[in-house]
């Protein structure tokens, strides 16, 4: 760990105070059963905001949208923000996507950081409060199957010593490198995020990193900074641990949510597959209780297919009320 990152990680008292003390990360099953006090808001994901997209949102009861197009100019992003505001809608998040913070080539790591800065500026122009960032990925090396991961790591340094009962030294090294490089990169992005008022939401998207709830939560909390949080996808992690366990572990570090469903099949290559919301293995009633327990109020973007926008809207209403 270099001195700059070490000092950043251990001197975040001001930001930590601003963020407040963590809520209890665990809660008993059966608590928070309702009526719910937390308020969830539904959003669609679209590439750009156009009049046609505005109509879809308003016709189907979506007050917000998450946008994806990184090729727009800041002027175009500001125009989209004006369109949304004129229609009583909110561009709540900007999907910055994959950033190759752990590339072996230092030039590529630098490019990823600069791309992150550009995306932060676009998010600000859109009026989004959060930018979604996937902070690296690993692949092409031997690693455990999803259900076989048993991580052992130093809670202070987050360095992994074991990935599973069997030995996977290449994976352990890759995970440790990814943690260090991601910490370096995100720490460099934080000053701009703070200046712009845009939170960096770190998400796992089948990137084979931070694969257990406690480890992912420790990684997010290592920054000790209010501008670095978790963008949790409720479907991406089911093959590693139930979605409600991810919610409880991440707790008040969750800044935004994606929703999709996943059908477990431990004999399959990926131990399952994505399916329509409601057709999979996720216990959405337990997830809703967990969100209430950790006090999450905020946006939930649909990242799923198989239903119409109107059907998804009705499904979200059922999820929000704890009836899905």
State where each predicted segment sits.
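Short amphipathic alpha-helices and their capping/turn segments at secondary-structure boundaries
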Residues: 74-86, 117-129, 242-252
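Glycine-rich, proline-tolerant flexible connector loops at the mouths of alpha/beta enzymes
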Residues: 67-85, 138-143
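Histidine-acidic metal/acid-base catalytic patches
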Residues: 2-23, 27-41, 48-58, 127-129, ...
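N-terminal substrate-binding region of glycoside hydrolase catalytic domains
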Residues: 56-75, 95-100
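Active-site acidic/histidine proton-transfer and metal-coordination neighborhood
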Residues: 17-20, 106-229
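Conserved, mostly hydrophobic/aromatic
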Residues: 57, 65, 84, 112, ...
């Amino acid at each position: 760990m270099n001195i700059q990152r070490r000092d950043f990680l251990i001197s975040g008292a001001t930001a930590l105070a601003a963020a407040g003390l963590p809520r209890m990360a665990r809660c008993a099953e059966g608590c928070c059963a309702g009526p719910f006090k937390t308020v969830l808001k539904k959003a669609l994901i679209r590439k750009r905001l156009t009049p046609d997209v505005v109509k879809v949102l308003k016709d189907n009861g979506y007050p917000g949208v998450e946008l994806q197009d990184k090729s727009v100019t800041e002027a175009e992003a500001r125009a989209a923000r004006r369109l949304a505001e004129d229609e009583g809608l909110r561009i709540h998040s900007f999907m910055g996507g994959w950033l190759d913070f752990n590339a072996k080539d230092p030039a590529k790591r630098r490019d990823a950081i600069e791309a992150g800065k550009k995306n932060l500026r676009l998010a600000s122009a859109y009026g989004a409060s959060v930018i979604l960032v996937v902070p690296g990925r690993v692949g092409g090396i031997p690693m455990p199957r999803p259900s076989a991961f048993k991580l052992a790591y130093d809670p202070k340094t987050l360095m992994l010593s074991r990935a599973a009962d069997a030995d996977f030294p290449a994976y352990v090294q890759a995970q440790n490198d990814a943690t260090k490089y991601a910490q370096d990169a995100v720490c460099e992005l934080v000053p701009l995020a703070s200046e712009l008022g845009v939170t960096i939401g770190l998400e796992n998207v089948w990137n084979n990193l931070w694969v257990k709830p406690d480890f992912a939560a420790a990684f997010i909390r290592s920054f000790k900074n209010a501008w670095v949080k978790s963008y949790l996808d409720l479907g991406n992690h089911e093959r590693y641990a139930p979605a409600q366990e991810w919610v409880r572990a991440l707790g008040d570090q969750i800044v935004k949510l994606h929703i999709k469903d996943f059908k477990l099949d431990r004999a399959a290559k990926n131990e399952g597959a994505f399916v329509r919301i409601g057709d999979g293995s996720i216990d959405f009633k337990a997830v809703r209780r967990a969100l209430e327990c950790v006090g999450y109020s905020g946006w939930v973007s649909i990242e799923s297919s198989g239903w119409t926008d109107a059907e998804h809207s009705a499904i979200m209403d059922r999820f929000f009320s704890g009836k899905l």
